[in-house]
């Protein structure tokens, strides 16, 4: 090659680099001269110095109504695998890698959570550092996420909230992509395969309510309690908590050796203090995992699980909502969001008190402390029940005359098509396997007809905060297509799926999921006043034959009167002296033999927070 040719090549290389630099003006830099995030109006072409890629059409949220994110845990995992592979690719070694997104505000917010979460998980950035990078330069703020309700949005969940929730899950061992089984997650979150997701692995499982008989009804697959038995036993689920009206006989669970509790409150409403305390006590008194369900396993289920996260792991309300929605999209709806926000301070106080007592007893060599529920009260001036009277479930709200919120959400989820091939299983060569300052004035109420995302939540946060379930989607407008599809046309297909999926529920080679660790500090801002329901109902369905001495209701000796429309009452007195045989928990399970760990995923050292 002549000297002139060398000079010409060098000049061209310089010009290309200058052009690339112009394209990256205003882009967010995550790794200096290596990894960037940019919002572009048109699709760019990769050059000799820069590699562009986008995930806007690959990872798509499956909406219920107007909700659009955040993307679920499987999509986050696949994104991290994809980006790790690019960063380690020999052909891209000397290139700058740019994850670009469009000006579609919904896609842009989801893309920001993906790369921000990558920075938190792998680059060890704090959520605030990652968010600062996302809004640096000429980047505008991001559209806040909303709930899966049909009405107006009254609560904004920000990109920063999502990053803080992921960070908190990392700290307590809920999120570990070295052991995460993406195929199992995507299988069981499908309606035809059980519609279940772990929120805290090994402890709290959210799932859709079982039915008396396994069948396909109006195109929606329904599962009987027995369909869940093998999976529950494999994963050491010992207790089931039902929050909706009685559809199946609880004796079907108790006869199989499970504990079963009824803590009923109205679909779409918030729980009373009594319901919340009893739920927390059940979870705290159970050595195994607790499976929680309502109608769809989204609203009421997510709300009580959120209370547990706030009390035992000091999640903020926003962190809890974000993490639960990443695990199980569509969770926590409408007033339930504000309920969690208002309960945060009192739940933190009770959690701190419990941990303090546990430390004192541990110093005296006492192995475990079970808090006394009689002396606890979740104080609030807003969410108090007006009466302690109990009503039968059939007296109100959930009746057979119309569809409830849970019915509609279940129907929408049941009409979804199987996962798109764009997010199919990764090839073997690819896969080896808020803190909000107490003085912050930010309100989560969204003003009508105003532009979302105009305020950066980071700028109001002055205290650094510490921050793994639904399937991949095939289209942003999938909801409209699902709603318009006739149920009769899909019945045969759903029947076939249901028949095969029930076999999967009985599949013995299901991987167990490891449990998390203790909590970490944060802060909170209360929410404006609102009203609530006072219809609540609780029953311990466990008879003497299947009870254990550690059953919460037995230790408390509750005496409940449930009044029906005729004024008759049923007294459910549970004695602390009742005894039953002890059930040995199933042995721990080894990982699936077909699972591969990913070379593209660096070692994760979860930072457990010890109080």
Curated annotation (Swiss-Prot):
Q: Which GO terms describe its molecular function?
A: protein serine/threonine phosphatase activity; protein tyrosine phosphatase activity
Q: Where is this region: Disordered?
A: 408-611
Q: What is the superkingdom listed in this entry's lineage?
A: Eukaryota
**Which InterPro entries does this chain map to?**
CDC14_C, DSPn, Dual-sp_phosphatase_cat-dom, Prot-tyrosine_phosphatase-like, PTP, Tyr_Pase_AS, Tyr_Pase_dom, TYR_PHOSPHATASE_DUAL_dom
Q: Where is the composition biased (Polar residues)?
A: 491-511, 554-569, 591-611
Annotated source species: Danio rerio
Q: What is the lineage of its organism?
A: Eukaryota, Metazoa, Chordata, Craniata, Vertebrata
Kindly state which reaction or reactions the protein catalyses.
O-phospho-L-tyrosyl-[protein] + H2O = L-tyrosyl-[protein] + phosphate; O-phospho-L-seryl-[protein] + H2O = L-seryl-[protein] + phosphate; O-phospho-L-threonyl-[protein] + H2O = L-threonyl-[protein] + phosphate
Against SMART domains, the record matches this protein to: DSPc
List, for all copies, the residue spans of the domain called Tyrosine-protein phosphatase.
Answer: 194-352
Q: What happens when the gene is disrupted?
A: Morpholino knockdown of the protein causes a shortening of the hair cell kinocilia in a larvae at 3 dpf. There are no other gross morphological defects in the inner ear.
List the protein's name.
Answer: Dual specificity protein phosphatase CDC14AB
Write out the ranges of the annotated region (Linker): 179-192
**Chain segments carrying region B:** 193-359
